[in-house]
Amino acid sequence: MLELTSSEFIYTGNPDMNEGKMTRLRASIVCEPTLAMCARQIHLQEYIMLGKGEDLTGGRTRDSIISDALEALIGAIYLDGGFANAKEFIHRFVLNDLENKQLFYDSKTILQEVVQAHGLEVEYELTGEEGPEHDKKFHVIAKAGNLFVVKGTGHTKKAAQQQAAYNALLHLKKNGTQFMPKGK
């Protein structure tokens, strides 16, 4: 349901885009972090029923659980209200603000391109970690010369770097840096 609706949306909105670009764009929409972001925007995590142990160990903030809940909600809407209602929900809550979602999904790559255009390199530094082994939270900073120094947090080092890269792009955009991902 989600992939079908996303594919149709991308194709009808970009009929001249090549297949590879369409595939990458769809992947950026239906990936776990993006779906978790969509779920958080509608506060879905507040309504997920979890076991006590899962709730106590941070399950309510875990991307995998939140994104799965969004997919389950879409399935429930489809079963209860039919294809048209599920499609409307996907358009309203998943396919909205695609530029921002694509920026989040590709943030490390896009940031690297932007920073290299300024003759610099992005450095990621692990500044801390907290929590038990099964529910670690990593903190990193990303910096590039005097362009930016920003923080990111995630349940993996990679996720923390991705969040820091996204924050750096938002910072650069806010300060007027023009950029567009290559091949998008």
Report each predicted region and the residues it spans.
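Double-stranded RNA-binding/processing signature
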Residues: M1-K184
